C-alpha cells in the first residue's frame, strides 16, 4: 500500500500540470493588416509588445497582406478571424454581399486628403480647374474628390484624372500632376517635406465629406459572439492608452521590433498619427455611420442604407 502512494502523487502532479498548461494556453487570433506594418498600426504593436493581448489570454498573429485588397475578403472566407480595413470600404463590400461587420476602430478620423505643392499654383481647390489630379484607387476617392470640387464650383469633368498607382507624393514632386487625392496626411505630407517639397492639404471632412473612421477592425458577421473579440478590444484599448501616455517609450518599442522603420518619415508619421487613434476602440457612433452610409448612397456607391447593426457593432 505504501509503495503505491508515490504513484498516486505522481499521477496527481501530472493531472495538475496538464490542467495548468491548459489554463495558461493562449487563444490564438489571426489579424491581417491593411498594409505593411507602419505607425497606423501602433496600438496593435504596443498591445502586442507590452503583453496586453497575452494578459487576457490571447496570442494575436499580426500579418501583413500579400495583396492589400485581400484582408476583408480573407475574413469573409473564414481564413482569418480579424482584419484591418476602412470604413468606406466596409459599406461598399457589405453592399456587395461580403459577410463583414465592424467590431472596433483603430483610426477614428479621416487620413485621406487632397494634396498639392505648397509653393505651386494651387492655393485653393478652385485653382484645380483644368489641372491634372492623380489618384491610386477609384470609387470612393472619385466620389470624395467630386464633392470637394463641387463645393468650389468645379465639376470632376473640369479636371484630368491620372492613375498614378501608389506613387502619390512622387507624382506631385515630379510635376506629373498638380495634385493627388488619396494622400494620407500623416505620410505623404511628411514625405514631401523631407525632400524639401512641402505640400498643402485640403481635408475632405472640411470640404463637404462627412467624417468617418479611416481604419477599423472587421470580423465575419456570424462570429461576433466570439469571446476572444471582447478580450481583443479590451487589450487594444490598453495599447492605445499606453501609447497616448508614453509616446516616446512606445516609439522605442515599435522600432525595436521593426528596425527597418526607424527613419525620419516614420518618426514624423508616428507623431502625427497619435492624436487620431480611437481612445475607445470598441465604441460605436451609430449616427455617424448612418450619416456616412447616406452619403455613399447619394454618391451612387451603394444602392441601399441598411441598419447600422447589419455591418457595425459595439461588443458587450
Can you describe what each PLM-predicted range is?
Residues 1-9:
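Bacterial N-terminal signal peptides that target proteins for export
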Residues 8-18:
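Bacterial N-terminal signal peptides
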Residues 19-25:
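Sec/Tat signal peptide C-region and signal peptidase I cleavage site
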Residues 40, 106-116, 197-222, 233, ...:
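Periplasmic-binding protein-like
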Residues 88, 166-257:
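Pocket-lining segment of extracytoplasmic ligand-binding domains
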Residues 225-301:
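Secondary-structure end/capping motifs
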Residues 293-316:
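Conserved C-terminal helix/tail region of periplasmic/extracytoplasmic solute-binding proteins
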Amino acid at each position: 500500500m505504501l509503495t503505491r502512494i508515490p504513484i498516486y502523487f505522481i499521477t496527481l502532479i501530472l493531472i495538475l500540470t496538464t490542467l495548468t498548461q491548459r489554463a495558461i494556453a493562449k487563444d490564438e487570433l489571426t489579424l491581417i493588416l491593411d498594409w505593411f506594418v507602419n505607425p497606423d498600426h501602433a496600438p496593435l504593436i504596443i498591445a502586442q509588445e507590452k503583453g496586453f493581448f497575452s494578459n487576457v489570454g490571447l496570442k494575436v498573429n499580426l500579418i501583413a497582406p500579400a495583396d492589400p485588397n485581400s484582408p476583408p475578403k480573407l475574413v469573409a472566407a473564414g481564413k482569418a478571424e480579424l482584419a484591418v480595413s476602412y470604413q468606406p470600404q466596409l459599406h461598399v463590400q457589405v453592399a456587395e454581399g461580403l459577410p463583414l461587420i465592424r467590431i472596433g476602430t483603430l483610426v477614428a478620423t479621416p487620413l485621406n486628403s487632397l494634396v498639392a505643392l505648397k509653393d505651386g499654383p494651387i492655393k485653393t481647390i478652385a485653382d484645380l480647374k483644368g489641372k491634372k489630379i492623380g489618384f491610386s484607387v477609384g470609387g470612393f476617392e472619385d466620389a470624395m474628390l467630386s464633392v470637394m470640387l463641387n463645393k468650389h464650383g468645379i465639376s470632376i469633368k473640369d479636371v484630368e484624372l491620372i492613375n498614378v498607382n501608389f506613387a502619390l507624393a512622387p507624382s506631385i514632386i515630379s510635376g506629373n500632376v498638380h495634385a493627388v487625392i488619396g494622400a494620407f496626411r500623416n505620410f505623404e505630407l511628411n514625405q514631401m517635406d523631407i525632400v524639401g517639397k512641402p505640400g498643402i492639404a485640403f481635408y475632405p471632412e472640411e470640404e463637404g465629406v462627412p467624417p468617418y473612421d479611416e481604419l477599423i477592425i472587421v470580423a465575419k458577421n456570424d462570429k461576433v459572439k466570439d469571446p476572444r473579440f471582447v478580450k481583443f478590444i479590451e487589450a487594444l484599448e490598453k495599447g492605445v492608452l499606453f501609447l497616448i501616455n508614453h509616446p516616446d517609450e512606445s516609439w522605442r518599442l515599435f522600432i525595436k521590433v521593426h528596425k527597418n522603420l526607424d527613419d525620419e518619415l516614420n518618426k514624423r508619421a508616428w507623431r502625427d498619427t497619435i492624436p487620431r487613434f480611437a481612445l475607445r476602440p470598441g465604441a460605436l457612433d451609430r449616427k455617424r455611420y448612418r450619416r456616412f452610409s447616406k452619403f455613399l448612397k447619394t454618391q451612387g456607391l451603394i444602392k441601399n442604407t441598411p441598419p447600422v447593426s447589419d455591418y457595425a457593432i459595439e461588443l458587450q
